[in-house]
A protein has these predicted regions:
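Helix-to-beta-strand junctions that scaffold the AdoMet/dcAdoMet cofactor pocket
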Residues: 71, 117-119
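Conserved beta-strand signature within the Rossmann-like core of class I S-adenosyl-L-methionine
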Residues: 120-130
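SAM/dcSAM-binding transferase cores
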Residues: 136-193
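Conserved SAM/SAH cofactor-binding pocket of Class I
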Residues: 2, 10-102, 110
Length: 193
């Protein structure tokens, strides 16, 4: 469990973890049971984390966990779709890091993440398998979002637990205001088409 959840949530942030006292703002899109967001909140004591999920059941759980582990002052839990939250003034272009793990194909996730990033922010897409075709589709979507692929890193989890990839993306200018598109559209009509 610890390898597949906690370690898997933190290894992509190994650079950031070298400076755990910096006050970065993170948003975990499609947070589910709280990974990677909760792990980041614990590992980075000055970080502010927003956990975003559309399921009320999941966000109720996340609020309770945040309270129980004593981090409710640094963790904000939002029950809403990324396509909606990405247009709110208080969230749009307001984060140093926007992350998503096991949410959707990378080209779809990019449309969720890029609108949240500030001018120097980075999006982190956590993936298992990562193919050249997915990279090509992501690059196509990023052009429309006024963003670029910064790097991709591959990692073998300990104890033969599998291969993981993290794809770092970043804005190269302001994301067009029409993104993210309305609820469901990014998945039905990916920008890579």
């Amino acid at each position: 469990y610890w390898i597949s959840q906690v370690f898997d949530s933190l290894w992509p942030l190994s650079k950031e973890l070298q400076h755990p006292n910096l006050s970065y703002k993170y948003i975990d899109v499609g947070s589910g049971c709280g990974f990677p967001g909760l792990a980041v909140a614990i590992a980075m004591p000055n970080a502010n984390i927003t956990l975003l999920d559309s399921s009320n059941k999941k966000t109720t759980f996340l609020k309770e966990v945040s309270k129980e582990i004593g981090l409710k002052t640094r963790i904000e839990v939002i029950t809403e779709r990324a396509e909606v939250t990405g247009h709110h003034h208080s969230f749009r272009q307001n984060f140093d890091y926007a992350m998503a793990r096991a949410v959707a194909p990378a080209a779809v996730v990019a449309e969720y993440l890029i609108p949240f990033l500030n001018s120097t922010g980075q999006g982190l897409i956590f993936k298992g398998k990562w193919t050249n075709q997915e990279q090509k589709e992501l690059r196509k979507a990023l052009i429309k979002l006024n963003a670029k692929l910064k790097e991709s890193q591959k990692f073998d989890l300990p104890d033969n637990r599998g291969i993981r990839n993290v794809i770092r993306i970043e804005s190269i200018g302001e994301c067009p205001k029409k993104y993210p598109r309305t609820v469901g559209t990014p998945r039905k009509k990916p920008l890579s088409n």
